[in-house]
């Protein structure tokens, strides 16, 4: 899959189904804890520095942000989960918004769940993965921030993630750093299987 980074645009920020765009394209949702690196992941994957806003403040994404990727697919950036400084009401609202999107959206082809390779998956990570499996949503798990651990320990950390999430053998697990585009073809190939 060849992406022209000059042909990427944010279509809409939505909070409810009647605001979802009608592109006819398949969608790939990006889910993960606040500050796991979703915005950096999007920017690196599409080869644009600031398409998705990067913030050191967790909980910045509060809507479903739809990005048209070169008229080939749509990335949907969903609010990060597990951020304690947001009110319980707000967290529940985000949770409902994400659940509605994932369980009702016909265009959804798969979900990329991002986890931090440096740490064991959290309870929230496990709940999200189990939720996706319950609804039989194809899932690609991306272990971000691989540049933060020694190369020799990457496989060990991936094994822990696979075990902790009790991953299906059919699901893909890829380690990743936003500092390099080397893994982009591998990730786009994994996505393409579901389009």
UniProtKB/Swiss-Prot annotation:
GO terms for biological process: division septum assembly. Residues 24-195 form the EngB-type G domain. Its cofactor is Mg(2+). GO terms for cellular component: cytosol. GTP binds at residues 32-39, 59-63, 77-80, 144-147, 176-178. GO terms for molecular function: GTP binding; metal ion binding. The keyword GTP-binding applies. Keywords: Cell cycle, Cell division, GTP-binding, Magnesium, Metal-binding, Nucleotide-binding, Septation. Mg(2+) binds at residues 39, 61. Belongs to the TRAFAC class TrmE-Era-EngA-EngB-Septin-like GTPase superfamily. EngB GTPase family. Necessary for normal cell division and for the maintenance of normal septation. PANTHER family: ENGB-TYPE G DOMAIN-CONTAINING PROTEIN (PTHR11649:SF13), MSS1/TRME-RELATED GTP-BINDING PROTEIN (PTHR11649). This is Probable GTP-binding protein EngB.
